[in-house]
Amino acid sequence: MRKLFLLMFCLSGLILTTDIRPVRADVAGLIPCSQSDAFERRLKNTTQRLENRLKKYEPGSAPAEALQKQIDKTQQRFDKYRNSGLLCGADGLPHLITDGRWSHAGEFTIPGLLFLYIAGFIGWSGRSYLQAVAASDNSTEKEIIIDIPVALQSVSKGFVWPLAALQEFSSGKLTARDEEITISPR
């Protein structure tokens, strides 16, 4: 009981003395794009170049409308950068922060994890298809000419690939036994 009380006392002292104010650390001299003069200059120069090209065409013509759409898309893109909280460098370009901070997770961490999930999904579905086809009579032919029902079944199994991989790894089915691995006689 004394140890529990002492632990609670130490934890409460630690919590009370910890400063938990939000801190905004300077990230390699980057500033928010909404406050960057170089970012605004880049927007102005980009749209001005497009507007100069637009003056060469008659209003309402196909090239003029295409350039106007490009100007609108450029302004929308810069507005997204400005409003998303991205940080810009001295060149006025947005920079992605990849240091693992949760405040910048949307820039690199979440897309990276999504990429790994999709790559694993494709690999697991392909592996499942090849294993299912290997048990059939015409396995070589089915590797070239895809059997759609088997492929759809394999793809449906692929959505839960992280759980299936963990299950197969823990059961030992995912990895080869030591006896199955050949050793070079060198």
Swiss-Prot record:
Instruction: Read off the SUPFAM superfamilies from this record.
Output: Subunit III of photosystem I reaction centre, PsaF (SSF81536)
According to the UniProt entry, the coiled-coil residues are none
The keyword Thylakoid appears for this protein: yes
Membrane topology, as annotated: Multi-pass membrane protein
Classify the main location: plastid
| Annotated signal sequence range | 1-25
GO CC, sorted alphabetically, is: cyanelle thylakoid membrane; photosystem I reaction center
Cellular compartment(s)? Plastid, Cyanelle thylakoid membrane
Domain of life, per the record?
Eukaryota
Q: Where are the transmembrane segments?
A: 105-125, 144-164
Please give the Gene3D superfamilies that the UniProt record associates with this protein: Photosystem I PsaF, reaction centre subunit III
Keyword Signal in record: yes
Keywords from the UniProt entry:
Cyanelle, Membrane, Photosynthesis, Photosystem I, Plastid, Signal, Thylakoid, Transmembrane, Transmembrane helix
One GO biological process term: photosynthesis
Q: InterPro entries, from UniProt?
A: PSI_PsaF, PSI_PsaF_sf
Q: What does this protein do?
A: Probably participates in efficiency of electron transfer from plastocyanin to P700 (or cytochrome c553 in algae and cyanobacteria). This plastocyanin-docking protein contributes to the specific association of plastocyanin to PSI.
Regarding protein family, the annotation reads: Belongs to the PsaF family.
Task: Report what the protein is called.
Answer: Photosystem I reaction center subunit III
